[in-house]
């Protein structure tokens, strides 16, 4: 597993995009989309609320990520196959125990667990629901959230089974850090380290070609692998690789 340490989540976003584009391998997904992917990666940010929280190279800027965070924390009226708010704050759809529907507020559980046992390693939330997700075409990428209290600070670790690091990870990190801040506020402590683990980090290099260009800077900031560079073809380097 590669570890990327950065002073802010916006910078972590830039560094992981660079790593995947320069060192990744190209393959077609089971949905027949052209991707470049890399081995497991952990993005570690000791000061997650420090700026920049959003990379200036990302298409999705402050207004978008703030709305995304609001939807995760408070829910949305939009209709999706799943949403992270429901999975974290009301887990258990279609499940029942002795005829009683399951409704688990996992974020409440995390906060209460750490209030009662500040050294606990059990303050976790999961999103996967096999009853639903094994049948979905679009199933949750975020799988697990763990919070720990160490040295008077709330650390958060998240695990993604798969993560679109170009167009999704920036908003994912921003929203989850807002969740970390919210839980820390309930406990009356500051935020500690935020660690974002992706088991299969990837970029859809054909679908999102226009999103790659601002990060790449026509080869000035990033020198992508041959297949990506040739597919783009927007700078002189594409003709030489």
Report residues per predicted region.
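Terminal, non-catalytic protein-protein interaction segments that mediate quaternary/complex assembly
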Residues: 1-241
